[in-house]
Every structure is written in structure tokens, then in C-alpha cells.
Amino acid sequence: MSTVNPSVAKRSAARLAAVQVLYQMEMTGADTERALQDAKDRRAAEPKGRMADPDNSLLNQVVRGVSAQLEDIDGHVGRALSGDWTVERLEAVLRAIVRAGAWELSARPQTPARVCISEWVDVAHAFYSGPEPGLVNGVLDHLAQTLRGGEMGKGA
């Protein structure tokens, strides 16, 4: 029987929570700090043990990073989408996932690209049972090839 490393579980929980916060911000117009505080308040009111507490540092970095670099992130994501797809055409939760994954690929080189992609695909699986996780995988893989080509074997 395998056990999950607590720090890995906390980072996974932070990614899931970041998507929820980014979604809340888009749906309600809440600013970054208000949305982060609301999420913290909700977690404090929840019974313990349902899932790992998120790594608050990573949660805050993702949400603040996406918020601060939204235009650049959307440019990267838009170029990674195929055909006539645009960032705006993506459903809001899916948009939050690819934005957060794109931010992590661009801003956290300490997270290996393949780990980053896998983690965000897992987040997509938490919300979707259809083709959406495949879209997340494709977009983030394209971005990883662009942003971290050497790590992904491109141009090596």
C-alpha cells in the first residue's frame, strides 16, 4: 500500500484551491486578496480531514501570479490552443485550470514540466470526466515545449 507524501498532497490541494479561487474571481469580480481571504475563511469552517490542507504559499503564488500576469498568460494559452479556439471560448473552470498551469510552467522552474502538466491534468480530472483533461494536457504540453524546450527535449 502506498502513501502520498504530505507535502505533495498539500501542493495538489493548493492547485485545486487555486482553480476555485480563480473561478470565484472571474464569476464575482472579487479582487485577488478578497478571494484568497474568502477561500481561507471557507477552509477554516470546513471539517478537517476531508482532504489535505493546501500549501498556502503555492496557493497564493498561483492566484497572485495569474492575476498579475493575466494578459501574458492568455497570450501564451491562446497561441497553444488549436484552430479557432480562444481563451475566452473556454468554459470558466477550464480557463482557470489552463491559466494556472501556464503560470506555473512559466514562473516555477523548480517544478519539473512533466510533473506540472500531470498535476494540472489531475486537477482537470477533479472537475471533468470528458475530453477536457486532454485539452489541458495538450495546451500545457505545447506551452512546456515553448517555455521549457530544453527540459522537454526540444532543441536538446
Curated annotation (Swiss-Prot):
Cellular component terms, GO, for this chain's entry? cytosol
Q: Does the keyword Transcription apply?
A: yes
Q: Which family does it belong to?
A: Belongs to the NusB family.
Q: Specify the taxonomic lineage.
A: Bacteria, Pseudomonadati, Pseudomonadota, Alphaproteobacteria, Rhodospirillales
| Alphabetically ordered keywords of this record | RNA-binding, Transcription, Transcription antitermination, Transcription regulation
Q: What domain of life? A: Bacteria
The record ties this protein, via Pfam families, to: NusB
What is any one GO biological process for this UniProt entry?
Answer: DNA-templated transcription termination
Name assigned to this protein: Transcription antitermination protein NusB
User: What is its biological role?
Assistant: Involved in transcription antitermination. Required for transcription of ribosomal RNA (rRNA) genes. Binds specifically to the boxA antiterminator sequence of the ribosomal RNA (rrn) operons.
Q: Which GO terms describe its molecular function?
A: RNA binding
The protein's matches in NCBIfam families, at most eight in alphabetical order, are given as: nusB (TIGR01951)
Query: Which InterPro entries does this one have?
Result: NusB-like_sf (IPR035926), NusB_fam (IPR011605), NusB_RsmB_TIM44 (IPR006027)
